[in-house]
Structure formats: structure tokens, C-alpha cells
Amino acid sequence: MTRKLRALLGRDGVLTEADELLVYECDGLTQHKRRPRAVIFPQSTAQVAQALRILKQARVPFAPRGAGTGLSGGALTESVVVELARMRRIIELDTLNRRAVVETGLINAQLSRAAAPFKLHYVPDPSSQMTCTIGGNIAENAGGIHCLKYGMTVDHVASARVVLAGGEVVDLHAGGANAPGYDLLGVFVGSEGTFGIATEATLILTPLAPAVRTLLADFADVNDGSRAVSAIIAAGLMPSALEMMDGATIRAVEQSVFAAGLPPEAEAALLIELDGLEAGLDTEAARVESICREHGARHVRLAQDERERGKFWAARKGAFGAMGRLAPDLMLQDAVVPRSRLPEALAAIYRTGAKHNLLVANVFHAGDGNLHPYICYDARQPEEVKRVKEAGREMMEICVQVGGTITGEHGVGLDKIDYLPLIFSPDDMDAMLRVRAAFDPEGRCNPGKIIPTARTCGEARGARPRRGNAETPRSDDAERAARVDLETRQRGDAETLRHDAIATLSSSLNNDDDKAREAIDQKREATDETREAIDDGQQSEPAQSTTVFARHPFNIEAAHEALSRIVGAEHVKASPHPYFAASSRRRVEESSGGVAASSSGILASCLSVSPANQDEACEALRLATREGWAIVPAGAGTWLDAGRASLRADVILQTSRMRRIIEHEPADLVASAEAGLRLTDFNDDLKRAGQWLPLDPPDDEEASLGGIAATGMSGAQGLGYGAPRAFVIGMRVALADGRIIKAGGRVVKNVAGYDLCKLFVGSYGTLGLILELTFKLRPLPAQSSTVIACGPLSSLQRNARALLDARLFPVALELLSPLAATDVQAPIETDEDCALMIRFAGATEAVAFQLAQARAMLKHERGIRHTIVSSGDELLWRALAALPLKASEPLSWRAHLPPGKLDALLAAEDAEGVAPFPAGSRWHAGLGDGRLHVIGALPSTLSAGVKQLTRWRERTRRVGGWLIVERAPREIREAFDVWDDAGAGAFIMGRIKQQLDPSDTFSPGRFDFDS
């Protein structure tokens, strides 16, 4: 194998000598060490693919590595390290579309430096950004100082080229509204190298804010500072950064080269940064200062210039290096708690340090509750090392007890693998393992990381050498029985551990409970022994599906009776949707030669079932799966028939009766609700606290939260706020067998396990039934106003580009065709006029400035008339969102493409001289984010309709986009692929469907991954 690798990569591309390998035995967290057998240095995607094929032939596991700055042991292995440091090119810097295509060995900070001359930057900025790589950021879903306002790495990656364990090269894209199929990219980001190796990435660049204000407040008590954090967020302010250092950290920094003039007697320093337009920024800074003083700030300093601002941030980012003054060694932890629980969690963490006679310092991302306790110690003292490990474990448990998670940005890796059962049940982790098996069936990608269960030979091999001598293989039945027994025991042990730990953790917040600690230790040891047994007994095979039930003919009378016993007869109805009624009649006609009615008069069609709660929903699912019925989940039923004509439904499972708001904590900017709740009702409740969920899907105010998540669709205001995938931070989902799994959590930053939320968002009800969702929220803007400009298409396009280049930051920038403009009552004067709707929202002073600037720009363009709507401008956008549902035309489709390509696509005729749209079409386009929505009539013949759609699909593909048909007559959907091509990732999507829904219970036929 080594000879083959050297033939491919050259002698200097393969390291095998012990002294050469020493540097690769740990990452930034030196407590974990694994000496690799070899380190290889590919220089291209093709070389990575060929190298992984060589490793596959030898059945050798591997771990990808960037700069080795990780802090969880995630890039360590005793096998082969695939080092990407020699793949560091910026392949393309596309400033028009605000994208950069890079190799993943590129250093993070180098990209922002390259983009700076164009007033752009790459937002994710972890403290290690001067050395960490883009690939490492993708693997860990890195955050950084400014992710409070701008999001994590997953929010800034448009696509990734990935090499799977077998050497297959696939391009992954965000799913939902933007691309066909599941959001493979979303679940890949943060997978810590266990799904494959990202070799190239298309990254989203963000305009630099024109103005910045940076404040430094110091406090005599760290709890006062943490309470100020919650108060700032609850006041409706959205800083770009909100960081805290405690007294021990302040004193260490001030004695180092990073000294910034922080008062050494202070016990907390809060660093707050506001950015945006110059207008209104001083007012916001004054509000922040006032809040800090109200909560006990002794001094509040405003950075007077860029030099002083740089000193503040150098002190914050240099804190880790300065900690060396406190002790020879550091154990850095990473956990997240709700902002409102910061004082409680901090107090318990300091008590834990005192209990173990250890100095604990804290420097952390206070705005999102992401704690980083530094435990100071001397690694030369074995007893002290033992106390450090115990203290670190207790700190994790404290954070879980107050509603948090075990990691916000550093990842699980080796360091936190034993803590995962504290936040996820065995069923949750089983679902994660099934998704992992879809990407890597043999388990050779970075085995032994994240999930504390070894499922394959690769996992067992990578975790530790196998013990004992080779034995005579057992029969398949005996092996399967042994594995099931082991997994069952482990599931029980892990679940017991989880409940026991949570039940006893409250004592660790208030006192020392050694007996409780011993009980948890005993359970953990039992779980470890079970895991070792699985490692030693596991065969080489991927995660296997559970029971698969056969399909049976749908007996509507028997189904009606059985379901009525679960939810009540009044909540079971026949023929709720014309599409499925017609589909069912067709099936009956084909099988019996005519439309059949039952003796009770129920038309042979599907049933609609409305459970009142999760228990009823799960019982209905268990029944349906046993009987082999096809289930289609539904909220308001807005997009119930989306997808291929082969979509089949026996039972439509509606969540409309499940509409409770479960929890809303304004100080945390987080709320949870059941999936059947309407978005309008949700926002009406949130507005009382000055907050909202800023989504505007294609809808007529009926869309449910679950439906919005299931389709993943957003509207015009996605430009300024983002799509649903950016707001869903947690969910509970029922699988076909009635088991409920949890994905994510209830904190705004969470990289524990795999982000299965991304998979379910945009899955169109093909993987499970979404029961409840947790969202991160936004402060309600103080002011919103819309400019409507009317005139020739080319003039409006030119002005829209100028508005974007001027960095005025509209939350929506939508171009409307003449008919669409008429529908929303835009004041066009001729049948040729288009309309440009520009919405600004935010602080009152900022919106006034934006409006003035937009008006000034529009005045200089001949032929353009404009008006401003301030009071009630939300009605305009509501009417726009409702267009696809209110239009009488039978066809609607959407496309997504690079924004810079949209202008040409709208204006140009194709090669055959055909105009962009047929006469009578309504369309609107998001000029800032590349969305296009078209509603229109169909030609008189089927072949002409298919030809028309094919022409448009080819045009969008040529510029790097997709076209997805939302609504069309059944004949069109039978003759035309409504979803477009999911690319090489389609086979992974098919595996995911098979792993999570092996009986094909949910929405069968909606997607066709084989084609």
C-alpha cells in the first residue's frame, strides 16, 4: 500500500518514519494522542480520490487533517492521516456573485485578505483563523467571534466537492428550495471527517459593514456581566459580537504581549461590537452602554479608532496563548448554555474548579452562551490530571443540566464522545449512525469519533486494535443475534446513564454529591464495557435497517375503523385532496375496472387523519407501518402534491391539531412549538416580546411551521434573513416505526453529533413526521419601509445592481413582471412596465438613511418612477408570497442560480429566438440571491409543455442553476422530471431514505433517487 501511495504522491508525499509522524499524534488539544502509521499529502481532488481507492483496496481507515488546530482530537488516528495542507489555492474569486471557490487546505484568514479589496470578507473567524484551514472549518462547523449575527460555517458554504471513502467524487449542495433532494451539504458540514473529505468548496462572501462600533465594559462581578448579555439581546439589539473574559483571563492577558489596557482588578470584561450602516449606530452604542451600566459596569470604553479596536480584539483572540502564564498546561472545554442561564452555569463551573482545587478561567462567546472554561493544571502531576478530567466532565454535565449542549464549535471528536448520551438517546444516535452509513457504509472515514457506538469493522479497527486471536466465524444468524443482544444492552445502559445523569446533575449545581457521582461513574463504565464488546464482535457490514414491512392493498374501511380508535372518528376523513383522490381512483380502476365505493359510502381514496398529540401521531404511524400503508405528512396542505406523479398516499397525516407553543425565552432569542402551528400565529405571539421568525414562504398565511421546514422554501426576504435551514436549531421527528428522535437542541450554537435538522428541512415528508421545532429568532425591526420603482426592465436591473454595490443591505430586492406587479398593486403605468420592490428594515435612523439613498439613486435614472410605502408595507410582501397559491394558471416553477447570471437570463432570448417567458406569465426574481419564480399557462399540447420546460431547464443549467417544478398537471409530471438532477449525490440520498425509512412508508414516489 505504501509503495502505491508513493508512486501516486511522490516520496515526499508519504511520511512513515516515527520522528516524522510525531507532530501528527495530537491536535491543539494535547491531552489526546494517536500516532498514525502514515501521513499522505495529496495535491488535488484527483489525487485524494486515487489515494482513497488505494486505502479501500487495503481496507485501511483514515482521518482527514487540515492545520491540526482542532480542540477535540477529531483528526487523530492510528492508521493513515490524509493531510490537505498542500491544497491551498483560491481557484476563483467571483466578486459579482460574492462567491469564492477554494481548495480546502486554504488558511481561513487568507480568503478574507484576498476579498478585502472588493469590500468583501469571509465571515467565520475562529480564534485560530490565522492558521486553521477551510476544510477544518467545514469539518467542525466552525463559528468564531462574529457568528452571533452572521451564523456558523454551514451558513457560508454554498457547495462542496467531496471524496467519499471509496474514492467517489460528489458535489454536495444545500437542498430544500435551492437544489433538488436532501440537504447533504448541511449534514456534511460538522461531520468531523466521518462522511468523507471535502477537497474544494464554494464559499459565500459577505459585504464588509461600512461602520463599526466596539465597546469594552468591565464589571466587578462576572455574573453582572453575564446578566448584561441577556439584557442586550432582550432589548432587541443584535451585536455582531458579544465576548466575555473573566478576571483570571484579564490578568493573564494584561501580563502578555496582548495587553490592551484592561483593568486588572476587574472580574469580567465584556467586548461588544455593533456593525452596519453609520446611521443609527451611535444610538445603538449608547443603548448598549446604558444597559451595561444598569447591570453594574464600572467603565464602558468606546474604541476611538481602528488601532484601539484592533488592540481589544487582539486581547480577546490572544487569550488562549496568554493562559500559559497561569499554568504549564490547559484543558480547554467547550459547551453552550442558554444565555439566560449564564450566571447559574458560571457559578457552578467556578464551584467545580474550587471543589477540585483547580484554577478555572473563562473566555467565551457570551452572545450565544458558548462557554470556554480553561482548566489550569500541571500534566506532570498524575493526581492533578485525574482531577482535571473529573472537573471537565462535571462542567459538561452542568451545562446539560441548564438546558445546554456539550459542544458549540470544537466538535465531539475523541474528547466528548462519552458525553453524547447525556444529550441524545440511543434512538437519536442510531439515526445518526444510519446517516453515517449512507455516506460511508464500510466505516473507514475517521472511525471511532463522535458516536459512542462502533458499527463496522472500520470503526472497531480505528478505535483500538482488536483483542484476542481469530476465531471461527459464527453463522449469520448467530452473529446477528449476538449483535442485536449487544446493541440492546448498550441501548439500555446508555439510556439509563442518560436519565441517571440528568436526574442527579442538579446537585452538582449546588453542592458536592459524591455518591451520585459514583453512580454515574459505574453506569459509564458499564457502557464502556459494552462498547468494547461491540468493537470486538462486530462484523464488516453497514448499519442494517430494522423490520421492513410489506405493502398490502389499502382497505379503506378497515383503516378508517382502526385509525378512529386512535384519534376519534371525527378526525378521520376521506378524500381530503383532489390529487390523491384522483390518484386513488386511478389505482382502483386499474385493479377492478371501475371506481369502487365501500358499503359505508366512503369513496375509495386516501384518508386524512388529524392526531391531537405526539402519542396519537406515533400510534397511527406504528399502525400504518405494520399494515404497509403509504403515509404523506401534511401541515396546512399547501404543497401536499409537490413532487413526482408517482407520489402515493393511503393516509395523509395532518398536524393541524398539534399547534402549541411549547416554550419561548426572549432573553435567549429561542422558541419551540408544535409543527401544526401556523407561522402567522407563532409570530403574533412572539411579537409581544418584540421578536419574530423572519420567514416568508410561498403562502397565503396558512403555512404551518412543520410545512415550512419540510419544504425548506423561503421567499423574497430570504435575501436579508436567510432560509428556514438557518433558523431551525432543533426538532423532534417521528420515524415510520413510531420512535421519536431528537435532532439539534434548544441553544443557538450546537455541533454535538450530526445536524439531522438539515436533512429533515427540505425533505418534503419523505423521511419522517416533524412533530415539533425549535427556532432561533430575530429582534423585530423598529421600522420597515418599501420602495417601489416602476419602469423598463433593463433600467430596474441596473439600479438593483447599484443598490447592492452601495451596501445598503435591503432585506428584500424583488423584480416583478408586469402581471405580477399588477397583482400586488404596484403602481405601474403601462403593460410593459416592471416593478422593483426594495424593502429596508431595522433601526429607524438606518431605514431613513436607506430610503434617502435609494431615492437619490433612482432619481438619476430616466424613465423610472418610484413611491415609498411605510405604513403597512408588509401587505405588499404578503401579496407577493401568495401569488403561487392564488394564481389560476396550472403551472408554477422556481429556479435558483448565481445572482449575477439572473439579469442575462431574464433579458435574453434563447438560441431559437424564443422570448424569456410566454405571454401571460407572472414572474418575480430575487436579484440579490438568484431566485426566480414563474407562474403561467401551459401550451395546448403535452409535448409543447415539456419542450418549454426543458428549454428553461437547459438555460438554468448552463449558468449553474436548477429548475424545480412546483405545480403542474399530472401529465406534465409524468413526462418531465420535476426535481431536476440531484447529481452524483443522488445515490447517497437514496441510501439515507433506505436507512431512515426502510419500508418506504413516508411519501413513496415523491423523489426518485434511482433516476
Regions from the language model: what does each represent?
Residues 263-292, 810-867:
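A conserved active-site cap/scaffold subdomain adjacent to cofactor or substrate pockets
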Residues 89-96, 100-243, 444-445, 451, ...:
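FAD-binding subdomain of flavoenzyme oxidoreductases
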Residues 224-243, 282-301, 798-811, 848-865:
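Acidic-enriched catalytic cores of C-N bond-cleaving enzymes acting on peptides and small amides
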Residues 25-120, 137-143, 589-634, 639-663, ...:
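Long, structured ligand/cofactor-binding scaffold of large enzymes
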Residues 470-474, 480, 486-490, 494-498, ...:
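Short polybasic linear motifs
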Residues 3, 8-11, 18-19, 26-38, ...:
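Conserved glycine-rich FAD pyrophosphate-binding loop
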Residues 464, 492, 501-510, 514, ...:
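Intrinsically disordered, low-complexity segments enriched in serine/proline and basic residues
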